[in-house]
Swiss-Prot record:
Its main location: membrane. It is a single-pass membrane protein. The gene is dpmpE. This is FAD-dependent monooxygenase dpmpE. GO terms for molecular function: FAD binding; monooxygenase activity. Coiled coil: none annotated. Glycans are attached at residue 197. Belongs to the paxM FAD-dependent monooxygenase family. It comes from Macrophomina phaseolina (strain MS6). It comes from the Eukaryota. GO terms for cellular component: membrane.
């Protein structure tokens, strides 16, 4: 416990020890704020067969926290992406290289094993005693005697206390359910049933890691778009290949009713792509036969409207969940940490040694939502669209993917660069790397809005010419 040296004795309980929770732990440590992290799993970094993309918006924050150098040594930076279509047409995109260009963002689009990232985030914590595993939270309550304190009860009977509880426990968040329950007795009213049931599932993903194949070049991504599915292959370092298949399901499901998948389901789906060419003579079956880890899961999609109640707030996948195609799930969660900590840092400094009242905490959490909700919604909307263009879901999206992106990609990529440049950072920590012009050049502005409008107009004209229909 470090309450004597923390800011005003303020303590944060973090529920969940994945990327979001561990990043928050590092940020709170930099702030000098006491915390305790509770992870329900028996280990911090289990093997789940998944890779993770670290994009410039997440990388910049991790660099501010002193973590990126270790990550960079284990990750593979993408240089190009070879994109293939069902009719045999293919093109090579330099979008990843442009993102990393010295005139852009200084950080690449990089991939690494998710388990390795978790190991780095945990190993570099200054005080690992603040992290406890096998601590599944069963309920959260207000302290019956001490005002301004919440209690988290774990399955083994332990009780933990904090002035702020942050749910970083993923899409199946127990913290979110407790927030909904507590909101029923809040003056602001209950969370409506329509919001509680707003998460949908239309896609599933098979994540895999295979032993390397000599014909596949590290850092040269291969993407194949099919009707209703997308395959991405990322050859990495240390003789590994990361890959994933995003598959459209038979219908749209509501959260809770989506199918659960067994290893046999993944094997059945992958067998259908066995003869699919990857590069040269390499077929997908070559990756499957060399698999080291495989997992299949539903891909939930939603941005919840309600993020907090009283002294309890949710971040990361517990409040916004998107598909993997854009690679922004974890990176957006890292931004959550930056925005929340910026606001908390300001509030604690304003109060000096005084306690943050209920009104203070509720105000800062409302500010967190107000400032960050538009950003999260924008990232979510783009992720939603990219996934469906990749899966060729509908005639218009087929047209955009096949006939617009290959030829007008650089103009349309400006929107992705805008998305990156508008990202949050930690305001109270320095930027370790020299600022690159991309962060300012591509930040949303009237000029960039006009450029995007002209690109959209071009797209509409092309679609009209192709379909013979007017969209004006």
């Amino acid at each position: 416990m470090e309450s004597s040296s923390s800011k005003g004795g303020f303590k944060v309980l973090i529920i969940g020890g994945s990327v979001t929770g561990l990043t928050l732990a590092h940020s709170l440590d930099k702030m000098g704020v006491d915390y305790r992290l509770l992870e329900k799993r028996k280990e911090i970094a289990p093997q789940e067969g998944a890779s993770i993309g670290i994009l410039p918006n997440g990388a910049r924050i991790l660099d501010q926290l002193g973590l990126y150098n270790a990550i960079e040594q284990s990750a593979i930076a993408l240089g190009t992406s070879d994109v293939y279509f069902p009719d045999g047409f293919h093109f090579t995109s330099s979008y990843p290289k442009r993102m990393h260009d010295r005139r852009s963002f200084a950080y690449p689009i990089a991939f690494m094993e998710r388990r390795k990232l978790l190991e780095i985030l945990y190993d570099l914590l200054p005080d690992k005693s603040r992290v406890e595993v096998d601590k599944a939270v069963s309920r959260i309550e207000e302290h019956p005697e001490h005002h301004g304190v919440l209690r988290a009860y774990t399955h083994d009977g332990d009780v933990y206390e904090g002035n702020l509880v942050v749910g970083a426990d993923g899409v199946h968040s127990r913290t979110r359910r407790e927030m909904w329950r507590l909101s029923g007795s809040s003056p602001t009213g209950d969370v409506p049933v329509s919001e509680r049931n707003s998460t949908s599932v239309e896609y599933a993903c098979i994540f895999g890691i295979s032993d390397g194949i000599a014909e596949l070049t590290p850092g040269r991504q291969v993407m194949r778009f099919g009707n209703g599915w997308t395959l991405a292959v990322i050859p990495s370092r240390q003789g590994q290949v990361f890959w994933f298949i995003v598959q459209k399901l038979d219908r749209e499901y509501q959260y809770g009713s989506a199918p659960r998948f067994a290893p046999e389901d993944a094997a059945e789906q992958c067998s259908k792509l066995a003869r699919l060419p990857i590069h040269g003579d390499v077929r997908f079956d070559d990756l499957w036969q060399r698999r080291k880890a495989v997992n299949m899961a539903a891909l939930e999609e939603n941005v919840f409207q309600t993020w907090s109640c009283g002294r309890l707030v949710c971040i990361g996948d517990s409040i916004h969940k998107m598909t993997v195609n854009l690679g922004q799930g974890a990176n957006c969660a890292i931004e959550d940490v930056a925005v929340l900590c910026n606001i908390l840092h300001h509030a604690l400094n304003e109060k000096a040694n005084s306690e943050l009242s209920d009104q203070d905490v509720e105000a800062l959490l409302r500010r967190f939502h107000k400032e960050h909700f538009p950003r999260v919604s924008r990232v979510y909307d783009m992720s939603w669209s990219v996934t469906r263009v990749h899966a060729r879901d509908g005639s218009m999206r087929k047209f955009v993917g096949r006939y617009v992106a290959p030829y007008f990609g650089e103009r349309l990529q400006g929107r992705l660069f805008n998305l990156m440049a508008d990202a949050a950072k930690i305001d109270f920590l320095p930027l370790p790397r020299a600022s690159r012009s991309g962060w300012e050049e591509y930040r949303s502005s009237e000029r960039n809005a006009l450029l995007w409008a002209s690109s959209l107009a071009l797209l509409i004209v092309l679609i009209a010419l192709f379909t013979g229909r007017s969209y004006w």
